[in-house]
Structure formats: C-alpha cells, structure tokens
Amino acid sequence: MIALEARAGMATLEARGLAYTRDGQQILSRVSVSVHPGERLAVTGPSGSGKTSLLTLLAGLDTPSSGEVYIDGIRLTGVAGPGQGVALVLQGYGLVSLLTAAENIEVALRAAGRAPSEAAAAAREALGQVGLGAHADHLVEELSGGQQQRTAVARALALRPRLLIADEPTAELDPASRAITLTRLFEVATGDGALVLATHDPEVAARCDRILDLRPAAGDDG
C-alpha cells in the first residue's frame, strides 16, 4: 500500500485505494493520495513504477482494477476535463500536427466554451508565457519536440484549470525553457489551484509541497 496522509478540508483531487493491473501484471497497488487547493504534488519513482499509469487513472483515461478517484468530492466516472476545472499534459501531447501552435490551443478553448476572439487572444498569451510567442503561427509538425511539449503546457495553462495533471512536462526541454515552464506550471497551484506532476527529476520534485514515491518500501508485499 502507498498512501500520503490526508489533510483536513475538501480535496481538489482524491484517490482512494487505487489498484491497476495490465496484461496480468500488477502496476499499482492500493495507492491513496489527496491534493488540496494550493498544493503541488510530485509523483516519483523508477521507470516502470506506475507514474504514468497513476496519472492516467487520475485523469479518468483508464479504469482502475479497484479504488476510486474524486474531484471536488464528486466521484470521477469519465475523462476529467475543463468542465471539472481540469487540464492535462500527458505523454504524446495530443496536438494536431497540421494546425499551428496557436490553433491547437484555440480549438481546446473553443471546445471549453470560449468565444473565438477570446480563444485567439488567450492562445497567443499562453504561448508567450512559455517562450513560444514567436512560434504561434508555426505548424506543430515544424516544431521541435521541446516546442511541442511547451505548446501542450501552454494549452493546459490557457484553460485556467483548478487542477493540472502533468506527466513529465519538462522532459524534452533545455534548462532555460525548463525553468520558464516550471514557473508557469507552479503558478497554477496558487489560490484555489492544484498541480500534480510526474517527474524523474529530484530537483523538480523538491520544489513541490509533497512527494508521492511509487517505489515499493522494503518488505512491501504489494
């Protein structure tokens, strides 16, 4: 069992006893954690420990073998999204290669109910925040891997989420871009916002308020 002690008050995100098995192999066993407004949670652990699987479950993109996920006290029964104040930055980024960086963000914002003019302005503002203002009109297929990663982060930021779930959101970035992007991500966890990010980087984890380490404890029978 892996658990972090719960704080008092309503959690933005709560996982209760999550277990996950894939192809007969147990990936996660009884993981419990809660994240409150203003908190930054790092999910750490060695390769294959289940970091990506956990974030996928927290986002509602897969179904746990057992256990439940709650957002603002309401049980999650589908994919989490802007309707629940949630934004995702997952591996693969989910960008449309034949649209520009700005258009990818505009599509997401308009799907979330923003007016076209507001979406266009917000897209460019978000790209500027991660240092991609000059690339707003570049097709995604013309961008480097790091630029695509920052575009995905900008899209999530533009949604103004109360909960941002990010899987290795700076893995492809050079030191300067990494610093800028982390600053913007951590700004989500101010006021009522919360951030959950998986990372293999101990420096990133150390900047978070709490760490959920998926490395099994010695003698843990799973």
Predicted regions and their residues:
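Helix-to-loop junction immediately C-terminal to a conserved catalytic motif
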Residues: 59
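ABC ATPase NBD coupling module
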Residues: 73-87, 116
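Short coil-to-helix segment of the ABC ATPase nucleotide-binding domain corresponding to the Q-loop/switch region
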Residues: 99-107
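Conserved ABC ATPase "signature" region
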Residues: 117-135
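ABC ATPase C-loop
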Residues: 132, 156-157
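Conserved signature/switch motifs of ABC ATPase nucleotide-binding domains
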Residues: 138, 159, 191
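Conserved ABC ATPase signature
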Residues: 139-143, 147
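Catalytic Walker B motif of ABC-type/P-loop ATPase nucleotide-binding domains
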Residues: 164-167
